[in-house]
Amino acid sequence: MNRLEVQGQVFELSPLRYTPSGVAVLEFLLSHEAEVIEAGQPRRLAFTLAVVAMGDLAQMALTTSLGCTVRIQGFLAPVRKDSQKFRLHAQQIQQI
């Protein structure tokens, strides 16, 4: 199973673009900060995650402004074939 849910602030929005077949694509960065418990100890997390939304979801995500808090559900995939870098492919985006 490859499923991820994360909440954070929209940090950077790229311009809307289209694939050669006409599918809308919106890429953005999500800034996440949280405290979790690991091995019984608190651990502070702060990271930026690359996100891509496609199709109708990309059009909907255009209404999201910088700094807006969102909850995203989706899956991780390599940025390109054989890459060690991953990004979150959004399947649901909810503004908080």
Functional labels for PLM-detected ranges:
Residues M1-I96:
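Single-stranded nucleic acid-binding surfaces, predominantly the OB-fold ssDNA-binding core
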